[in-house]
């Protein structure tokens, strides 16, 4: 055995960011008496190139999130030929005129927040026969600069979505920045229970452990997996 081989054999295996995040999810779930399998890790690959995504695919990650339909359409068809079991989630705001493209490409749509989008998605689903799961986005902090329906508008939006045939999996939120997120996550959980929904898309790189302890079923992790976000022209 050469000295080089001996040194390599003795070197400890580095813990990847993906493994570290999965471990943190498992620990947070245990605190709440939950199973790690109850939490879906969405690796948010928006603005990151294929070269940054492939290592996670090789490590077994199969659920990814994108913000924009066009960007996802540029990256994912070729990757899906090699990894056909990938589930792709749209987590950004969606224009109604992109509804058909989103339905064709994504397996889940997280930011359904207005009646016009519900109508467009319902039409696209009827025409294509594809019915991605949908999460209704709630503006949980009543912030005018953010998307999401007002809490008071949620019952009507949910009724419209169900009438249009959207498979409503649950609710999604982005809590206000620089404040304790737990009360907002708890409020989203209460709203979901009140409306007979079980899915909770909440929690990002800075607060996903809190979200998991409060009941998140989907956490959206970007920078903790990929590092600083890239930019697009």
What are these regions (language model features)?
Residues 2-198, 204-206, 212-214, 226-228:
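Conserved alpha/beta-domain cores
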Residues 232-233:
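Active-site loop ensemble at the mouth of alpha/beta enzyme cores that anchors a bound cofactor
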């Amino acid at each position: 055995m050469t000295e080089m081989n001996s040194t390599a054999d003795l070197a400890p295996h580095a813990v990847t960011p993906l493994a570290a995040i999965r471990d943190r999810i498992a620990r947070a779930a245990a605190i709440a008496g939950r199973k790690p399998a109850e939490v879906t890790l969405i690796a948010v690959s928006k603005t990151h190139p294929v070269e940054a995504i492939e290592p996670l695919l090789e490590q077994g990650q199969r659920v990814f999130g994108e913000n924009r339909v066009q960007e996802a359409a540029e990256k994912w068809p070729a990757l899906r030929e090699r990894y056909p079991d990938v589930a792709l989630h749209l987590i950004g705001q969606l224009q109604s005129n992109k509804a058909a493209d989103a339905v064709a490409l994504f397996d889940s749509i997280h930011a359904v927040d207005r009646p016009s989008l519900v109508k467009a998605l319902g039409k696209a689903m009827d025409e294509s026969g594809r019915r991605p799961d949908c999460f209704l986005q709630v503006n949980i902090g009543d912030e005018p600069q953010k998307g999401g329906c007002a809490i008071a508008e949620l019952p009507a939006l949910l009724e419209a979505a169900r009438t249009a045939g959207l498979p409503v999996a649950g609710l999604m939120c982005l809590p206000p920045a620089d404040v304790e997120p737990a009360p907002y996550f708890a409020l989203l959980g209460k709203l979901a229970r009140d409306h007979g929904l079980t899915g909770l898309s909440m929690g990002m790189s800075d607060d996903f452990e809190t979200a998991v302890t409060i009941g998140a079923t989907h956490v959206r992790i970007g920078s903790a997996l990929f590092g600083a976000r890239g930019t697009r022209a």
